[in-house]
C-alpha cells in the first residue's frame, strides 16, 4: 500500500497546515499518510473507499481522514478536491483542544463524511484561499494567522454540520443524499421522498441534477451499482444475492445495468479482470 509522507507535502518542518489542490483528482489506489487531512469536494463525482467502505462523493462533501485511515478514489468524473493537510490535532503551535471540533469515533463508528451546502462551501473556499496565500511565510505572525484560519474552518464545518436542517432546499437536498447512502437498497418512491424532505419533485430533480450531474433515478442506480461492485470484490455472496441486497429485484436487469455502467460484467469484477487498484 502506498504511504504518503508529510515531508513531501508540507512547505517546511515547522508548518502545521498545508493546502494540496487536486484539480482534478484522478483515480488513485489505496493509500494512507503520516498526517491528517480534510478533503473538500469542490465539484464532480466519484467513489471514496474509506477503510474498505464505499461512499459516493459530490460537490459539498467533506471527508475527515486520520493518519491511520486508508482510502482510495475510483470512478471519478471531473472530481475536483482541495485537501487541507495537518500533522496532528496536537501539533499546532498556537492552538490546543482542536480534537474536540473534529468528528469523534463512537462504538467503532467514525462519522468521516459530512456535507455542506453551496453557501458554506463558498465560505470554506475563501478560508482555504487565505491559508494558501500565506504558505510561503514562516514567521510567527503568519504561522499564527494560518492556524487561526484553520480553527475558523473547523468551526464553520462543525457549525454547518450541527445546524444542517430543513431551513432551505439546499440543506434538505444534502439530508436527502445522506439518507440515500443509508437506504439505497430500499424501494424508493421519489414523490414520497420529496415529501419527506419538504421538496417539490421538480426542485428535487433540478437540484440533484445540478449537484451530481445525474437524474435522481440515475444517481440511485449508480449508488446501488457502486455498493454492489464493492460487495463483489469484498464478499463471497452470489451475484443474485448481491443484486437483491443492493435494491435490484431482477438479477438479469442488474447485470445489464452493471455492464453498462462499468463496461465489465459482475462476474468479471468478481474474478478481478478489471485490474482493480489495490
Swiss-Prot record:
It is found in: Cytoplasm. Keywords: Activator, Cytoplasm, DNA-binding, Repeat, Rhamnose metabolism, Transcription, Transcription regulation. It comes from Shigella flexneri. Residues 191-212, 239-262 bind DNA. GO terms for biological process: positive regulation of DNA-templated transcription; rhamnose metabolic process. The gene is rhaS. Binds DNA as a dimer. It holds the Pfam family AraC_binding. Activates expression of the rhaBAD and rhaT operons. The keyword NAD does not apply. This is HTH-type transcriptional activator RhaS. HAMAP family: HTH_type_RhaS (MF_01534). Residues 174-272 form the HTH araC/xylS-type domain. One of its GO terms (molecular function) is DNA-binding transcription factor activity. One of its GO terms (cellular component) is cytoplasm. The record marks 241, 250 as: Interaction with sigma-70. It comes from the Bacteria. Its main location: cytoplasm.
